[in-house]
């Protein structure tokens, strides 16, 4: 009887080990790991959209979970400007520091993001076509702790869904003229 219980327990731990190994292999070899991209066509000119990307008060209206954004440098929005963002999703709080790495008002903004668990590069590009503008977002994130790297195959699709929801919310508030 004891041998049977030991075999079941050993088999259970073996299955868990295989699952963890599979996630580890998937996170190490997944093409585009930590990479997100999405675009949305907004029926407004770029000049009406850009403030929603740069104004902390407006960002809170469309970025789910953004609780706070405060500048860490003076001089307004410019290359080199830094800010701190606090994201709250459920009970989980993430503190991030952002630095503007490229800026062309109403056309482009790129930001480097750092936090305890990850680093990332985000790029917003606006392209006008007639009365509408296509906003293209790309984000490339690198997870530092082993556990986050292991869970990357689960994190990235979830982050992609959040991104797509946020961009649809942005489209809605900008087009409503709020």
What are the residue ranges of the model-derived segments?
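Beta-strand/loop substructures that line and gate deep hydrophobic ligand-binding cavities in soluble
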Residues: 4, 112-165, 172
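Hydrophobic ligand-binding cavity/cleft-lining segments
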Residues: 4-8, 12-70, 74
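Hydrophobic/aromatic beta-strand elements that line small-molecule binding cavities or substrate pockets
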Residues: 38, 85, 96-102, 121-128, ...
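A short, structured loop/turn motif at beta-sheet edges
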Residues: 43-47, 74-79, 101-107, 125-134, ...
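Extracytoplasmic/secreted envelope proteins and their assembly/folding machinery
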Residues: 46, 50-56, 63, 80, ...
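Hydrophobic pocket/interface hotspot
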Residues: 48-53, 59, 83, 100, ...
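Short beta-edge strand/loop motif at the mouth of beta-sheet-based domains
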Residues: 57-95, 103-108
